[in-house]
Amino acid sequence: MANEKRCAIYNRYSVNAPQILDKKRDELISYCENDLGIPNHELFEEVGSVLEEREVFDQMMARIEQNEFSDVLVCHIDRIYKPGYDPEKLAEYVDRIRAKAVIHTVE
């Protein structure tokens, strides 16, 4: 990756609230472009429960670890991994991301 910033935007909500995905998508893109000043971004979205496989998230993580992104934006840190489900796993993912990129949250 050159010196240009590139942000991975991760947007995920439960199957019980898929309509929130659209609203949060607009909020995340606006925050990335206007507040962070990073117009170069890629959106990763999925709807699912905490127990499901997260194929899109796994693809994003692989690309973060290949240094494709300088920044990662999520609505809230628990979008990375549900802390109530496994706080150690959340910490592991956060550490893996922070080793390669800066994590930003809107909330």
State what each model feature region is:
Residues M1-E107:
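Short, structured surface patches at the beginning of a domain
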